[in-house]
Regions:
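Conserved class I S-adenosyl-L-methionine
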Residues: 198-207
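Conserved SAM-binding loop of SAM-dependent methyltransferases across substrates and taxa
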Residues: 210-221
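Non-catalytic, mostly N-terminal accessory regions of nucleic-acid modification and defense proteins
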Residues: 1-195, 199
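Short glycine-rich loop/turn motifs that provide flexible caps or phosphate-binding loops at active sites
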Residues: 174, 208-210
């Protein structure tokens, strides 16, 4: 099902609105990107009929881990916590469980602490805020199992939109850690990636930041 990018972006930015006040964009981006990742992975695995396999297998393992270890690590587990006390603590445990089973996610997905009272408030304030935040990611336009953004890469579009907005709101130059998709596409074409026939050729971006230029290079190859 096609979804308008304006709808997608509006819901993503609404999730940011829920966190304003307790922290600035350089901090709440970690919360939003974590939720976006969890929602995307959950939806995609559901769509493939492999919901019980929601995990990226640790490269150190040469066989599937115990199936029991795969459970309790999805966005649906966040949904089950809505309206409950200590929801932040529960969300942190779910994320920690996923990070423990996937060493590549250590220090990436678990840097945002959903039980931080200084940033999210305490007691009912935190519970209500996180419940509302989860509800936003349940909106139809954020259903990544079925939606396509006008034929484009929907998760890439969502990520680039957020990075652009975070860069602008934090007062930093957009080019400091984010290269607009339009610029990345032009650069990928200028260096002639599409005409390269050497399978061993590589692209180096020593200041890759969020990696948008490298992604566009792959698209052009």
């Amino acid at each position: 099902m096609a979804v308008k990018k304006t709808q997608l972006y509006a819901s993503l930015w609404a999730s940011c609105d829920k966190l304003r006040g307790g922290m600035d964009s350089s901090e709440y981006k970690d919360y939003i990107l974590t939720l976006l990742f969890m929602k995307y992975v959950t939806d995609k695995f559901k769509n493939k009929g492999a919901y019980e396999d929601i995990k990226v297998f640790d490269k150190a393992h040469d066989k599937d881990p115990d199936p029991e270890k795969r459970t309790g690590c999805s966005f649906d587990d966040f949904i089950a916590l809505k309206g409950k006390k200590n929801i932040g603590e529960g969300m942190d445990k779910i994320i920690a469980r996923l990070a423990d089973e996937n060493t590549d996610l250590k220090g990436v997905i678990d840097i945002a602490h959903f039980n931080d009272e200084k940033k999210l408030g305490s007691g009912k304030e935190m519970d209500d805020k996180l419940t509302d935040l989860i509800s936003i990611f349940q909106r139809p336009e954020l259903d990544f199992s079925r939606n396509k953004a006008e034929g484009d890469d929907i998760i890439g579009d969502a990520y680039e939109f957020l990075m652009r907005k975070f860069a602008t709101e934090s007062g930093k130059s957009k080019g400091q850690f984010y290269t607009p998709a339009e610029v990345s596409r032009i650069l990928a074409n200028v260096v002639g990636i599409s005409h390269c026939t050497d399978a061993s050729a590589t692209v180096c971006d020593p200041a890759c930041g969020s990696g948008s230029l490298l992604i566009r290079a792959i698209d052009a190859a």
